[in-house]
């Protein structure tokens, strides 16, 4: 944990129309996160945005209806991350439940196939008898793949949420809330959310066509797959706007009630998470990394198989396999992070200031882990980072992570415009992107990326800061308030879990688990004694027995151990006073 340069409190925002019976603390927290009206607190499915607002969805459902009616062989082509895995599993399960007996799936291998619907992946789908291809969480930039599919006589339905380029692939139908002419109010749907909306629309069309009645089957309850929607949404770190909070809350509720896929249950077991107390953060920090480990180090088909399987015994075997991959991923990441920090420290020792944007490369880095590495270095140095690893044939694959104030994909697009041929290909979002380039061009890219970011970004944004919700009163430092905050979510990207600040007397401090600081503190003005823990501290600084008072940025939490529940604080940052 690296102390930030400054602590900033959120500006107070006046609620407009929040319920009168809402506690003042929650009103303040919600209003500062853009929730100012009662309807923004909706968590039931009736509050979901209607699927009819997604452009192209009618054409897409007609394609699928005709495919079902004609028993067309559908191959769902996914992606090798958690969003792609949940999108793939949800689509296959939903199509089967809707009466499609001729559907299978294909997930590109990160190392052999690369990202998206490439011509090579189309050939694999063709070999599996594809008469129609449906992409999930990819496809919006797959011009060559779509053209190749058409050359083979295979129609293509693209469902994606990534930002489109200047031109769209010539797919037979495209659903993407980020299309320029799409009126869908939420631009933050994950790939699994887009797939879920398509299945809802298809069910409506099938019902209207008499599909279920003619076969003597009941229309399926697609809400059964909201556990997958929640997992993919949180793991993909898309903003939790009102619509995504509804999807996530509904999925969490199903998991807590024990109504989840065996694969998710097995992941919860291996991660030692109690379904009854599951929070959105558990999906992002416990389940998501294990699922992602398959795509990072091996093949995401293992992850999809886990989500598809109906047998808890089989699910536990696959979950153990994913857990082992995740442990290996952690070890690889630890070594890569040490090497990356050495590169940064070498630059600092040379007297140079770090550029506004960091591009880093090491010939022994693992291309499946560079995204996590970029995220870690970004958090430490608070600037956009792209980490590269060798991809073979003299090329590099990079993964970038950005900060507020720099749109990563727009930055890459600008570089591509200014310096054609610098990159082989690129794509992504505001906060994350992927790209590839020739190894011989890395030094040039490193310089140009650093210069562009320095030119584009406000230097003040390169200073790390912690954004706090202010102080808690002593009367608010209770188990009841901690439980209220836990229940008030789901918290996540762009809707952060409440973080408070305050000054405390430091009464006890010791290191546990090698790098975690366990403390006991008391508010300086008096109040309850609080147990706290700060994860991954700098052990060259802490513990410091000379420090008697500290300023903390912390979350109020409940520690549950052997049936006992006690109040504790999770310390994000600590400053000696």
Describe the function of each predicted region.
Residues 136-192:
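Histidine/acidic-residue-rich, glycine-tolerant segments that coordinate divalent metal ions
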Residues 161-162, 366, 429, 516:
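Histidine-centered active-site/metal-ligand motif
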Residues 131, 172, 551:
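Conserved acidic residues
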Residues 90, 170-213, 226-229, 428:
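Short alpha-helices
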Residues 66, 166-176, 264, 521-528:
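Acidic-glycine-rich active-site phosphate/pyrophosphate-binding loop
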Residues 69-70, 314-320, 324-360, 393, ...:
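Mid-to-C-terminal polyanion-binding domains and interfaces
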Residues 144-148, 373, 480, 484:
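A short acidic, amphipathic alpha-helical/loop segment
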Residues 2, 8-132, 152-153, 207-441, ...:
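Hydrophobic helix-and-loop "lid/oligomerization" segment in the mid-to-C-terminal part
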